[in-house]
Amino acid sequence: MSYEKVLQAGKIVIGTKQTIRALKEGKAAEVIVAEDADLPIIEKVMAAANEANVPITKVDSMKKLGKACKIQVGAAAVAILR
């Protein structure tokens, strides 16, 4: 289900740094994180999302999340922008 959200989203940012930046700037409407990503990376993104009061959705695979973003590599985090 969340993979479809990414596919249908108008604007997204891909990657932990860009996701955290979007959260700090108040541009993220929702954050999607891959559960198979490194825990310290996920924790940073989730902490930023909680601080910004943005909903977090977890998916099982970085590879599938990357594919949903139409990139050839895995993605640990994606932000759907407002």
Curated annotation (Swiss-Prot):
GO MF terms on file?
RNA binding
Q: Which residues cross the membrane?
A: none
Keywords, A to Z, come to: RNA-binding
What broad taxonomic lineage does this protein's source fall under? Bacteria, Bacillati, Bacillota, Bacilli, Bacillales
Q: What is this protein called?
A: RNA-binding protein GTNG_0100
InterPro entries noted in UniProt: Ribosomal_eL30-like_sf, Ribosomal_eL8/eL30/eS12/Gad45, RNA_bf_YbxF-like
Q: Pfam families from the entry?
A: Ribosomal_L7Ae (PF01248)
What family is reported?
Answer: Belongs to the eukaryotic ribosomal protein eL8 family.
